[in-house]
Amino acid sequence: MARCTTCWRRMMRSTGWATSLSTPQTHPGELLTEEDASSAGTEDSHDEVQEATPQSSINPLEVFRSKLYNLDDSVSVWSDFLRIHLHPNTVSILSEYAHDPEQDMFDVFGYGQQLLGTQRVSADLEDRMHFFVEDCDSLQGFQVLVDPYNGFGGLAAEVLEQMSEDYDNKGILTFGCYPSMYVRRSPIVDYHRLICTALSVTKLSASSSLYTPLSVATGLGREPGPMASFPYLTYNPSLHYHTGGILATALDTCTLPYRTRSDGVLMTELTNTLNYSGRKMAALSARLPFPITLDGALAASLSQFVAAPDLVSLCPGVKEPGRSFMQSVVLRGVPPNRICIPDPAAHADSIFRDCRSANDCLKRYLQYVYPGTLNAGTVVHEPLTVTTPFPHLFNPEITHDGLVGFKPRSAVQGVEKVPGMTSLSSQSGLQGSLAALHGEVEKVDIRRFHRFLDAGLEEDDFKEAVESLRQLARAYQTSDNEMAEDSDDDSD
């Protein structure tokens, strides 16, 4: 029986890149996605090929490889580059609000809750959900992407609460996607986002099997904070087209364990492992591309990671990886001829000297670097496909097949595929993120924000949400960050 997941999403997602709602048919060993999330796009008249270098400097083989194109000025929303055809039941339009309006903004948590209370929206979403659920041979659960900083957080909270009751034995893996930068900024708008974020974190984590905030920004409160830095990527944080592409690669990779047929796991097995002891939030970190040099091997790259694990956090507020309680690590796209150390005799002291496969290398790495962590490692041979319309983010030293080269690639040549690595973890670093969010929101006098009160939020309910946020932060507290917190209190 084919296993499938259903991804709940909304129209006009500015961050864009997401798994489509589908029940794909695959052969054993293939991924259970209709197309790789990072290659879901369209080639159209918007494509612009950059000026070519002189003919004498171009390798004839590069003519047949991926060319550069420029969509930075023409892509606005995810539907601008959607390649696959959506089923008519996929999209539900909320006619009560417009996308990015100047007035009547959908920026209050309760507005979304009120929408689901209407017969039209409730019946429409329920009918569409049942259509796809009934089309699944064996439903694993639901993979949910949501904007948690506005009214869609309230809508999602109501939908997930109903889903958790109707499908209590299925997994609900929710990703809250935050922009790296906000176009509209003012004190009142920033506080609205802060309140929506706090309410979403408590409500969505309660109704989900696992909830993961996502952003290339490092802050979860009113200020987005600095942007995440990747060693081999150059991106524009003001373009959702760029930041959405980065998040898509991480999402597509970290969800592979329950989307592969061979040696895969169920979504519930993954979420139940990570949400142990009531820790229903997880942090996602990634390395794109995973660095393997032209003359190097996986074992050599992991040896560098042993000295200093170098995954980049995509969880706002988690600046540095903390102690991991449990984690699911996925390594993908390592070429078969780039696994073992070329000369084992010259590396007799390496912990990878007797490893003969990518699985062996990853297992040894996790045992050595995270000895006190419950680790689950997954190796997938398929690399990330980053051809059109994926944005050109890769630095010139990355070759067309994703390796770290010794000279810049041709100016007319793009990158076609890359290896990648992600870690989805329950870790102590979340305590600092949640504590910082709690510290901001507990100072809010909700009585000053009448639109939230008019939308049905009670003062006692808000205080309860703030307390739930504090309790959630305490669930990730360890002796180390508890001592750091006490030290900060003493200095104050």
PLM regions: where:
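Terminal, contiguous helix-loop blocks that mediate binding/assembly
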Residues: M1-D492
